[in-house]
């Protein structure tokens, strides 16, 4: 079982949060696991702990960094080995022109600050959705939506550029044309071995394309991560449903750090960051405000799930084609 979900008493969670300036950690467990698969070979305290951070980014990059740093430091204090930050953790601008103006290359000052933070805290960081000026910036004058994974030494171990750009018109939420200022990525990133398990990288809108999650799972992913900035209309309708579906069909943990609240006068995000286990249970979640939630990753439970429900062995590529392996 996930240690912070059922085994520690609620009083312990309250003690862990004492003195925390941001809203209290929220942990949710709503559905029991099947009895035959509920026991782990490890005690809960031996399982790796991850932290999912929820923030309200603004156009002020340094204020955003300060908020994220406080959450990462708190996650470190609580014993997390890996902290997940949402899409646009660096900033959310008022318009495309400001987005381009505030963007930086991966070797810029801002990512250097996060690298130092990871190194000082001794924690891995999933930085989902960095506004990156790529090597083709001078030619395209467009950026990449880049998910960066830092190890505990502050080194970049993987970077994935969002492949599915969000060009949509949602009634009541307003139009979005990410492709007006963003270039699509050209490849998926192979899953990366971390202290919590093998992590497959994706970003927000990617969760609507199950082929991506299946391909990452086939490549060895045990954890899929979807840092996001869902809106106030699509969030209540689709957010949890999509994340649970991706977890069930891929038989992976799904970790989704989210933006929340009002960023400026024209944009707000849904929040509700969460962790979903391979059974499809929401095992940890935040509410609507800034803060973090914690979960323990039980890879023994994941392997049990895959043995009891061997769906990848039952696939019929002769009927509907096969997914090409990651290069």
Curated annotation (Swiss-Prot):
Pfam families, A to Z: CN_hydrolase
Superkingdom, natural source: Eukaryota
Gene3D superfamilies xrefs: Carbon-nitrogen hydrolase
Residue numbers annotated as active site: 87, 162, 204
A GO cellular-component term linked to this record: mitochondrion
One MF annotation (Gene Ontology) recorded for this entry: deaminated glutathione amidase activity
EC number: 3.5.1.128
Family annotation (CDD domains): nit
Cysteines paired by S-S bonds: none
Recorded catalytic activity of this chain's protein: N-(4-oxoglutaryl)-L-cysteinylglycine + H2O = L-cysteinylglycine + 2-oxoglutarate
Gene Ontology terms describing biological process: amide catabolic process
Transit peptide: 1-36
PANTHER family: DEAMINATED GLUTATHIONE AMIDASE, NITRILASE-RELATED
Family, per entry: Belongs to the carbon-nitrogen hydrolase superfamily. NIT1/NIT2 family.
Protein name: Deaminated glutathione amidase
Lineage, uppermost ranks: Eukaryota, Metazoa, Chordata, Craniata, Vertebrata
């Amino acid at each position: 079982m996930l240690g912070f979900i059922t085994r520690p008493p609620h009083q312990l969670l309250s003690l862990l949060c004492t003195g925390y300036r941001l809203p209290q950690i929220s942990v949710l467990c709503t559905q029991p696991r099947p009895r035959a698969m509920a026991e782990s070979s490890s005690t809960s305290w031996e399982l790796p702990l991850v932290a999912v951070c929820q923030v309200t980014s603004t156009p002020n990059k340094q204020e955003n960094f300060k908020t994220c740093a406080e959450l990462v430091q708190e996650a470190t204090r609580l014993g997390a080995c890996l902290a997940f930050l949402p899409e646009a953790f660096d900033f959310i601008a008022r318009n495309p022109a400001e987005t381009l103006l505030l963007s930086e290359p991966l070797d810029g000052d801002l990512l250097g600050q996060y690298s130092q933070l990871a190194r000082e805290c001794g924690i891995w960081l999933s930085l989902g959705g960095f506004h990156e000026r790529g090597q083709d910036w001078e030619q395209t004058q467009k950026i990449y939506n880049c998910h960066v994974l830092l190890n505990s030494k502050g080194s970049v171990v993987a970077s994935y550029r969002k492949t599915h750009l969000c060009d949509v018109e949602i009634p009541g939420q307003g139009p979005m044309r990410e492709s007006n200022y963003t270039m699509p990525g050209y490849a998926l990133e192979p899953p990366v071995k971390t202290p919590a398990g093998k992590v497959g990288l994706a970003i927000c809108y990617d969760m609507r394309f199950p082929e991506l999650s299946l391909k990452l799972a086939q490549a060895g992913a045990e954890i899929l991560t979807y840092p996001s900035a869902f809106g106030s209309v699509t969030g209540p309708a689709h957010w949890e449903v999509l994340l649970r579906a991706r977890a069930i069909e891929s038989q992976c943990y799904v970790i989704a750090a989210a933006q929340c609240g009002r960023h400026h006068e024209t944009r707000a995000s849904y929040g509700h960051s969460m962790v979903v286990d391979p059974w499809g249970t929401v095992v940890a979640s935040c509410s609507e405000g800034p803060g973090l939630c914690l979960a323990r990753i039980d890879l023994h439970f994941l392997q049990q799930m895959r043995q009891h429900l061997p769906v990848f062995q039952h696939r019929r590529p002769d009927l509907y084609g096969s997914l090409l392996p990651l290069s």
